[in-house]
Amino acid sequence: MFPGRMNPKMMRQMQKMMSDMGMDSKDIKVLKITMELEDKIMVFEKPKVQVMDVMGNKTYTITGRAKNIKKDDIKAEQKEQIKDEEVKLDITKEDIEMVVNQCEVSEEEAKKVLEECNGDIAEAILKLSQ
């Protein structure tokens, strides 16, 4: 889109324009990503992940090299290990505060509903509003 490098002033202007349009972007630290497809498993070690929030909808961009593993090549115990790896849900204080402010509930209740909704703020607010 832009040939060469962007100077810092252009970058700030672009970020301000995105913010004005309701878009927010940030990098998150990720150690490992595993994607299970029909015929293989893709493992990204130390990928770069960027989260773009556009009016409440989050889009994740993954950059890095994937290690492709054919499902036929994986031993049964490795399959179980991959399936049993628990994904820890990261619910931030800001997410909890947003639900508390929108629904006028306690922080404990907001956190519980966010966990039930897998961290989806909009779904949690809708659930508490009913």
From Swiss-Prot:
Provide the function of this protein: Contacts the emerging nascent chain on the ribosome.
* Stored InterPro entries: NAC-like_UBA, NAC_A/B_dom_sf, NAC_arc, Nas_poly-pep-assoc_cplx_dom, UBA-like_sf
**Record has Cell inner membrane as a keyword:** no
Gene Ontology biological process terms, A to Z: protein transport
Q: What is this protein called?
A: Nascent polypeptide-associated complex protein
Ubl conjugation is among the record's keywords: no
All residue ranges annotated as the NAC-A/B domain in the record = 8-75
User: What is stated as this protein's family in its record?
Assistant: Belongs to the NAC-alpha family.
Which HAMAP family does its entry note? NAC_arch
- Quaternary structure (record): Homodimer. Interacts with the ribosome. Binds ribosomal RNA.
User: What PROSITE patterns is this protein classified in?
Assistant: NAC_AB
Q: Name one Pfam family in it.
A: UBA_HYPK
- A GO molecular-function term, please? RNA binding
Organism superkingdom: Archaea
> What phylogenetic lineage does the species belong to?
Archaea, Methanobacteriati, Methanobacteriota, Methanomada group, Methanococci
Keywords tagged on the record: Protein transport, RNA-binding, Transport
